[in-house]
From Swiss-Prot:
It comes from Riptortus clavatus. One of its GO terms (cellular component) is extracellular region. GO terms for biological process: defense response to bacterium; innate immune response. This is Probable antibacterial peptide polyprotein. The keyword Kinase does not apply.
Length: 678
């Protein structure tokens, strides 16, 4: 570029030549101090022309364009304060274009370059000068170099252009940072080990598809200390599994089973070396597979590998943890003593619980003894007269899930096995029978609670209370022989009596007679017990058949219900034998069982309005004719339930219905009124 003074002199000379050519004297204006062209304008004009690939122009050609682009500041007034020269930095996009366009001619690419000029490169003031910033090679460039080594640039260049990330295409460079090394990712390391026996030409398409987005672009992170690549649990387990196989057979499976964690991403912060602990599943598999060949069992081993063993970082190192024998192992030893291992091993594999198949060992705790469960103790007493060979298959089927695996609980003081109420009741029932006849039934009736689980905390000895059902059965079964009633008694044993822990010891509780027992006594007085007993058994409610006794309370009297009082007044002229079946059918569920309420002051039986109205209706009728109607019209409220709280005595007022009935019945005979009442 020429200086502004030279340009000014050129303008004056051109003016003088033009005046001389016209042969006309023209006075020159008063000379003014020369004003230089601002350096910024000159730089912009020259820089734009050079960027478009044009040769530098002569001063004569450049002058008209310079005049048009003179800014108002340059046309008059004082010049702005000069600023230090600002260099034009090449953008990352320009650098990337140069590397891409090297094999192409500038003439072919120039139109594309003009269209792709960013607005930042086309004009405006340059930013404040900053220290030069180097262009770092991205991870994607490094990975592309390793991928494209066997290919020619001409084949790969179109693909490279399409895969250029927006970050690489333009914008200013970031602030300079300390040089950052490019670390090899775990995925690259794993790919190298996988692709060693294969040729790069075969694997390259697969490698391109498996490139993770993290490897494709972006700035490198801040440099950190080198991090070693730890062998994952999956690698260790694969080595032990693949030892008898060749790499060529296993490599496809290895590729499919590669976890996303092994395929890419940054390495974790360095930590102290962590040992690879053998999982419980590995230990159990070794003991199971000892009599089998590894080649036969390997497919099953691969299928049973848990997701925890397949990948992920190792946990922080912890003190070595011993593998405790589970309750299931102890129980299996006692069960399998008369059998050979070869017969039982398939069943053992199927019954391995998920807890025994993998996962980390728990924190070490003091040694815990294996307590014998109540089910084991009960089975011993049951199986004494039988041979183990006959009972062992049944024992295997009845093993509860609680006995099959899991960690042992914290050690607790030894807990005695208490006899359940069911055992006590069975003893009283089975006295006239031989054990050999009852033992199969006893096995079937063992409840799940008696079959396994931990023993409760030791408590003071608890007496076995006789339930209300036992007391009622004794009174019912007195005229019958035990041999006839025992089968029915077994069927009627409630689940509550069959097992479960005894409650905390409480003072002895008396067995109260229920309202149903009192009413049955009054009903059954003229009938023989032999006729009524089967029906009584069917009508025993579940509440009367078992359950714990309530806390002792002051003695509670048995109140007669309103229904009992009304039945007495109805049944007086009839024989109890005729009415008893109907009475049984009309017994409400409330009268059939349940605990007695808290004692309250005695409550009188009030006559309901319906009873009063029925009396007035039935006065002209014979009781024999009116009784069926009375029975049908008994309200549910009068048939049972607890009596209400006592209230001040209220007089019985005649209802409107009673008044209507009186008016209707007075002029009509009794025979005509009866159908109408019904």
């Amino acid at each position: 570029m020429r200086s502004p003074r030279v340009i000014h002199l050129a303008c004056v000379i051109a003016y003088i030549v033009a005046v001389e050519a016209g042969d006309k004297p023209v006075y020159l204006p008063r000379p003014t101090p020369p004003r230089p062209i601002h350096p910024r304008l000159a730089r912009e004009v020259g820089w734009e022309l050079e960027g478009q690939g044009l040769s530098p122009l002569s001063e004569a050609e450049l002058l008209p364009e310079v005049r048009e682009r003179r800014s108002p500041v340059d046309k008059g007034g004082y010049l702005p304060r000069p600023t230090p020269p600002r260099p034009v930095y090449r953008s990352r996009r320009d650098a990337s274009l140069e590397s891409e366009l090297s094999p192409l001619s500038v003439a072919e690419v120039l139109p594309e370059v003009r269209e792709r000029r960013s607005p930042v490169d086309k004009g405006g003031y340059l930013p404040r000068p900053t220290p030069p910033r180097p262009v770092y090679r991205s991870r994607r460039d490094a990975s592309l170099e390793s991928e494209l080594s066997p290919l020619s640039e001409a084949e790969v260049l179109p693909e490279v252009r399409e895969r250029r990330s927006p970050v690489d295409k333009g914008g200013y460079l970031p602030r300079p940072t300390p040089p950052r090394p490019v670390y090899r990712s775990r995925r690259v390391a794993s790919l190298e080990s996988e692709l060693s026996p294969l040729s790069e030409a075969e694997v390259l398409p697969e490698v391109r598809e498996r490139r993770s987005p993290v490897d494709k672009g972006g700035y490198l992170p801040r440099p950190t200390p080198p991090r070693p690549v730890y062998r994952s649990r999956r690698d260790a387990s694969l080595e032990s599994e693949l030892s008898p196989l060749s790499e060529e057979e296993v490599l496809p499976e290895v590729r499919e089973r590669g976890s996303p964690v092994d395929k890419g991403g940054y390495l974790p912060r360095p930590t102290p070396p962590r040992p690879v602990y053998r999982s419980r599943r590995d230990a159990s598999l070794e003991s199971e597979l000892s009599p089998l060949s590894v080649a036969e069992d390997l497919p099953e081993v691969r299928e049973r590998r848990s997701p925890v063993d397949k990948g992920g970082y190792l946990p922080r190192p912890t003190p070595p943890r011993p593998v405790y024998r589970s309750r299931r192992d102890a129980s299996l030893e006692s069960e399998l003593s008369p059998l050979s291992e070869a017969e039982v091993l398939p069943e053992v594999r199927e019954r391995r619980s998920p807890v025994d198949k993998g996962g980390y060992l728990p924190r070490p705790t003091p040694p815990r003894p294996v307590y014998r469960s109540r089910r084991d103790a009960s089975l011993e007493s049951e199986l004494s007269p039988l041979s183990e060979a006959e009972v062992l298959p049944e024992v295997r089927e009845r093993r509860s899930p609680v006995d099959k695996g899991g960690y042992l609980p914290r050690p607790t003081p030894p807990r005695p096995v208490y006899r359940s109420r069911r055992d006590a009741s069975l003893e009283s029932e089975l006295s006239p029978l031989s054990e050999a006849e009852v033992l199969p039934e006893v096995r079937e009736r063992r409840s799940p609670v008696d079959k396994g689980g931990y023993l409760p905390r030791p408590t003071p000895p608890r007496p076995v209370y006789r339930s209300r059902r036992d007391a009622s059965l004794e009174s019912e079964l007195s005229p019958l022989s035990e041999a006839e009633v025992l089968p029915e008694v077994r069927e009627r044993r409630s689940p509550v009596d069959k097992g479960g822990y005894l409650p905390r010891p409480t003072p002895p509780r008396p067995v109260y007679r229920s309202r149903r027992d009192a009413t049955l006594e009054s009903e059954l007085s003229p009938s023989s017990e032999a006729e009524v007993l089967p029906e009584v058994r069917e009508r025993r409610s579940p509440v009367d058949k078992g359950g714990y006794l309530p806390r002792p309370t002051p003695p509670r009297p048995v109140y007669r219900s309103r229904r009992d009082a009304s039945l007495e007044s109805e049944l007086s002229p009839l024989s109890e034998a005729e009415v008893l079946p109907e009475v049984r059918e009309r017994r409400s569920p409330v009268d059939k069982g349940g605990y007695l309420p808290r004692p309250t002051p005695p409550r009188p039986v009030y006559r309901s309005r319906r009873d009063a109205s029925l009396e007035s209706e039935l006065s002209p009728l014979s009781e024999a004719e009116g009784l069926p109607e009375v029975r049908e019209r008994r309200s549910p409220g009068g048939q049972g339930g607890y009596l209400p709280r006592p209230t001040p005595r209220t007089p019985l007022c005649r209802s409107r219905r009673d008044a209507n009935l009186d008016a209707e019945q007075s002029p009509v005979s009794e025979g005509v009124v009866l159908p109408e009442v019904r």
